[in-house]
A protein has these predicted regions:
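Core nucleotide-handling region used for phosphoryl-transfer chemistry
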Residues: 1-316
């Protein structure tokens, strides 16, 4: 049975035709898989996996990987047993994942994990801003000849504001992933080993190379206590990946649904009294109000979590 048919039969995988493409299907794990922790060879692979009707992989994202402590496999004890040193540690940029791959006609796929979405426009926008025509030809040739997807983190604060502040649009190259069913990074994702010709695209900021358990513990502590970063992404010598998010980032993000519900009028402050973050939420609400911004992508007024993060960093 083809992988596409196996994905179609799996109740924990969504398979949807990609808008604007012929015979191309986006495979992603379902909300239930995420909610109940149903992780197996199909659900972990179905995270931005794009298959044609003949079972060819045309675009591919990362396999699902987890935060430290998110499950038994990523407890610190399990990680210490499993990893192979050295481990490369990169800054986890706070944007959204873009997947760029070569079409046969000299053009590109610009996909999010779901395929052609409204955010695909932003991927293409930032890509075109950061590259010249010669750069794009170099990138297309490399992706086509290597049969690879370039996974990127897209930063576009005017249209897609997150928690960590950025002053301008950026695009960080995270990895070159082989377009095949088995996950394989085909090039060093954190430094430019492919020569010049990538315009103003940046490679993900590799800030630590870790050689033993003691160093790993120290870097984890640095990441957890960071006041300015979302967190870190780790990749060991066998391409086993895991991540962490800073305590401040997690605290900020946890309040986002509540703040947006209060802004929309669906709920009141006191509706969140049973939440662990209520004391902080109440203090921000009574002292500063809920900061807002106009989301140019969704066309809605939303809680400005960058401002909330700044309040927490400096006042609470």
């Amino acid at each position: 049975m083809s992988l596409l048919n196996k994905m179609l039969e799996n109740k924990y995988v969504n398979v949807k035709p990609v808008e604007g493409e012929d015979n191309l299907y986006a495979c992603n794990f379902t909300r239930d898989a995420f909610k109940h922790g149903i992780w197996n060879q199909y659900t972990t692979t179905a995270r931005g996996l794009f298959l044609s009707s003949d079972d060819t992989v045309c675009v591919r994202g990362f396999n699902k990987f987890f935060n430290i402590g998110e499950n038994k496999e990523t407890s610190l004890e399990a990680i210490f047993r499993k990893v192979e040193y050295p481990i490369f540690c990169a800054v986890k940029e706070n944007g959204f994942l873009g997947l760029i791959s070569a079409k046969e006609n000299g053009e590109f796929y610009f996909f999010t994990k779901a395929g052609n979405t409204i955010y695909s426009i932003l991927i293409e926008k930032v890509f075109l801003e950061k590259t010249e025509e010669t750069d794009r030809k170099n990138i297309w040739n490399y992706l086509h000849d290597s049969n690879a997807t370039m996974a990127v983190e897209v930063i576009c604060p005017e249209y897609d504001k997150h928690i960590i502040p950025y002053k301008k649009n950026e695009m960080f190259i995270l990895a070159f992933i082989k377009n095949q069913k088995t996950f394989e990074i085909i090039n060093e994702p954190f430094i430019n080993t492919c020569g010049n010709g990538y315009g103003q695209l940046q490679f993900a900021r590799n800030i630590y190379t870790i050689w033993d358990e003691e160093e790993l513990e120290k870097v984890i502590s640095i990441g957890e206590n960071s006041r300015i970063l979302e967190g870190f992404v780790f990749r060991d010598s066998n391409n086993y990946m895991f991540k962490l998010k800073s305590n401040l980032y997690k605290k900020t993000k946890a309040m986002r649904p509540a703040m947006n519900s209060i802004l929309s009028g669906k709920k009141k402050l006191e509706d969140f009294k049973n939440k662990p973050y209520y004391g902080t939420l109440e203090k921000i609400y009574l002292t500063f109000g809920i900061p807002t911004w106009y989301n140019n992508t969704t066309k809605r007024v939303e809680a400005d979590m960058t401002a909330v993060h700044d309040i927490l960093k400096n006042n609470i």
